[in-house]
Amino acid sequence: MPVNVLIVYDPKGPAIEALAAAAGKGATATGVAEVVLRRVQEATLEDLLAADALMLGSPNWSGITGSLKLWLDETGDLWEDGSLAGKPAAAFTTGWGRHSGIEMTLLQLIHWLLACGMIVVGLPWTDRMRSSASYYGATATGGVTPEDLMQAEELGARLAKVAAKLQAP
């Protein structure tokens, strides 16, 4: 039975949409996952509860966007009752400069995941990281490059595989 990977992102800008789609493509390509892509304005708590794995994405607006922060704040009951604990999760972001706070945005997303007791899935080192992505998650700086899309696909695939391993008997 395939795992359900939920990708929730704030669609402010085409770069974040491209990374979300690439992450979904990577998860689907594993053959072990069904992917649900949701813009934050459309995502529901039911989507979150039904997910076996979660990926959050936000453009860097000096941190995550207000829209995504509001949605995360609405999940407080799930945090309190532990509904998300033990589920694997990952993060992605975009920004206009490599040193404009991208890493801090990823860490803000990861902080929420950890607070919920989720298992954070990152990216292992590759030579591509000299110009794209981060250990913390997938990134794009300025425009989206083929390397950025590849990193997002790899993160989606890693998340799906970890979720499948956790579901295995």
Model-based region annotation:
Residues A85-P88:
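Short, proline-enriched alpha-helix->beta-strand connector loops that line the catalytic pocket
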Residues A90-S131:
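Short, glycine-/small-residue-rich phosphate/pyrophosphate-handling segment
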